[in-house]
Amino acid sequence: GRSFVFVIDRSKSMGGQGLNALSAAQKQLDRALAELVETHQFQVIAYHDKPVYFPNRTMAKAVPGNRQRLKEFFGGLAAFGGTNHELAVLAGLRVKPDVLFLLTDGASPELNRVQLDRVRRRSGGLTTIHCIQFGFGPLQEQTSFMQKLAAENGGQFHYVDMRKR
């Protein structure tokens, strides 16, 4: 792919009072961005009940200056509020990326069948969706909405046990 969107949950459960997964998500993002070259484009959407965009609602070039501005953007984020996974994923699909990464603890509310179908239709088979879930201990669910979302959109699911970090 040449264009990437990273959709990162910043709801209360991702913060220091919960999993402290927001900082782990930032590390995952840093690693991913380090792989990009200047011809790649990216966007980051941090969400709770509503999305916040970096740099705005368009793509940014993967140049060092934008990576530095992204660090500043993350520095200003706090984990609070509820979670609207569908709104955030649909916002990420609006810029028609080749690849979308969803990074979340997968907390309720999960995406239901209607919402999963809506995401798949919006993606139109043009965007690969990878899901990275953060949790404590072994993965509890064998068929979470995140596993379905990845499988139905050509992507992969990855689980990060925060106790092993």
Positions of PLM-derived features:
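VWA/integrin I-like adhesion module and closely mimicked acidic/polar interface patches used
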Residues: 75-77, 106-161
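Short, solvent-exposed turn/loop segments enriched in Gly/Ser/Thr/Pro and often Arg
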Residues: 48-49
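…and closely analogous acidic/polar surface helices at protein-protein or active-site interfaces
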Residues: 2, 12-44, 58-66, 76-78
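Extracytoplasmic/secreted envelope proteins and their assembly/folding machinery
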Residues: 22, 26-33, 67, 71-74, ...
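Surface-exposed acidic, glycine-flexible loop patches that form ligand/cofactor-binding
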Residues: 33-36, 91-95, 120-123
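Von Willebrand factor
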Residues: 52-54, 61-101, 108-110, 133-142
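Loop/turn elements at helix/coil->beta-strand transitions in domains of secreted/extracellular proteins
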Residues: 2-3, 38-42, 95-100, 124-130, ...
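Residues that scaffold, gate, or flank divalent-cation-dependent active/transport sites
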Residues: 9
